[in-house]
Amino acid sequence: MNISAVFSALLVSIMAAVLWKHVKLLDQFYVIEEELELTRQSQELSQVRIDYQAALQALVEDGTRMVCSGRMHTDRVCRFESLCYSTEAEEFVFFHSNASIMLPNLGPRRFQPALLDLSSVDDHNTQYFNFIELPAAALKFMPKPVFVPDVALIMNRFNPDNLMHVFHDDLLPIFYTIQQFPDLDFESRLFFMEGWNEGLHFELYKFMSNKQPLLKEQLKTLGRLLCFTKSYVGLSKITTWYQYGFVQPQGPKANILVSGNEIRHFAKFMMGKLNITLDQNAAEAYIVLFSRSMNRLIVNEAELLLALAQEFQMKTITVSLEDHSFSDIVRLLSNATMLVSMHGAQLVTSLFLPKGAVVVELFPYGINPEHYTPYKTLSTLPGMELQYVAWQNTEEENTITYPDRPWEQGGIVHLETKEQERIKKSKEVPRHLCCRNPEWLFRIYQDTKVNISSLIQVIKSTVKKKLGLRRQKWTQGLYPGKVRESKCQASAQGTSEAKLFVSWQIPWNLKFLKVRDVKYEVWIQEQGENSYMPYILSQQNYTFSENIKPFTTYLVWIRCIFNKTLLGPFAEVLVCST
């Protein structure tokens, strides 16, 4: 081989090495540039600074971690570290590593039917949440993740255009989910994954966080793979009081766990966000009438306003969601004496009424008030202390129907003629499931001429407290503790008579309370028997002789009762032998 060939080969090798080093430097530059861009995208989400390399390393090494509260998918909320979301696949991703945690580890039961509900509506098949699983090693084949540094609350809104759903299904559950978990606060960010646009009441959702809530569609602009450093998925349902009839006809939930105290605490928070100060010294009593402009109209509204003003000697004010700002409506309701409205979502604003106020709900012809009670249930929650009145139009000549409208507005022309005639002749809509029952829609979208004398009579016969006295101090019912130092002494007189002397001390908390009526309930049960003898007593000791037998063992339970309805816990059982 000649010297020129060797030199040429050496030159090629040197050039190749230089080019390779240049390419590696260029690749490294692009990687750094990409990481800077991903860091910038993360910074756009939040002011929290994030170390991108450290976050990526933690995701690869630790994978996703999940710990949930709740036994069933209907009451479960899950806390995640490094839960990811593919905006292309529209799937949440759980990355497995040796350090991953998944509690509960349900295996295939996670799909029966889901890990959890994304909304506060129980077990609705459009609201289920789950994730797909991948090994953390798969990250090398996927788009570089964009990390979300904010603590995230990931959920579905159920129907953001309906005010009842906004408050009952979304705002109240969000508010108390934030109270429930220490990591969540008003610096957390809300992520709405149901796919709706902002909706009519988006400004109300903004009160739940100091950061702009993000919609599912907006996530695509942030990156192809989003990873939430810390997130909570799902909502607490503890504040919900109503079920909408997806499985059985609608009605109050079987086990209501919220009271008016929690509702009013939330209402106070909302009023603060709306910059409304409650006027405790407002002297003038007035009635608010909710007016509707599209359907379910009160056709003699002006006449009704005048009659209410004359009958109750109060000013009457008309408001509507279309013509008044939400803050103006709440400001008026917060000092109102009475709210009158046709059945509809706007009645959820009754949660802003002062204690003692009257809620009058009007129902069109054929709609049984006992079958549709979300606002009655709200008004009568313990601690809400609202007076609720339901009035139904029972006169068919006072209703205006619209059979030619589209079906979703109560039209029935799409039905067979025989079915149309049956619906028109029907006197009452039978109980039904949600949400497209044509007879229900036909009747609920009627307009109504209110029989004013009938309505006033119903109000006066139902309202027991004098109107305008709502600003008195109201006391929340507090429950007694256990009675203390309970004792039992038995005595027998021969073989035919015996007595039990039972005594106890007052509950410890009674000495700090002013209670009008204090009673004690005593149960006496012969050991081995299923039945017992109950007694209600005013004193703290009593000698029982009726039905007490010698040479017999008795079990004795004692508890305190405040004001006839507030039942305390039973003290430890006493065992007494005669």
Curated annotation (Swiss-Prot):
SUPFAM superfamilies: Fibronectin type III. It is found in: Endoplasmic reticulum membrane. The keyword ATP-binding does not apply. Residues 1-4 are cytoplasmic. Keywords: Endoplasmic reticulum, Glycoprotein, Glycosyltransferase, Membrane, Signal-anchor, Transferase, Transmembrane, Transmembrane helix. Disulfide bonds: none annotated. It holds the Pfam family Glyco_transf_61. It catalyses: 3-O-(alpha-D-mannosyl)-L-threonyl-[protein] + UDP-N-acetyl-alpha-D-glucosamine = 3-O-(N-acetyl-beta-D-glucosaminyl-(1->4)-alpha-D-mannosyl)-L-threonyl-[protein] + UDP + H(+). One of its GO terms (cellular component) is endoplasmic reticulum. The chain crosses the membrane at residues 5-25. Its main location: endoplasmic reticulum. Its EC number is 2.4.1.312. Belongs to the glycosyltransferase 61 family. This is Protein O-linked-mannose beta-1,4-N-acetylglucosaminyltransferase 2. It comes from Xenopus laevis.
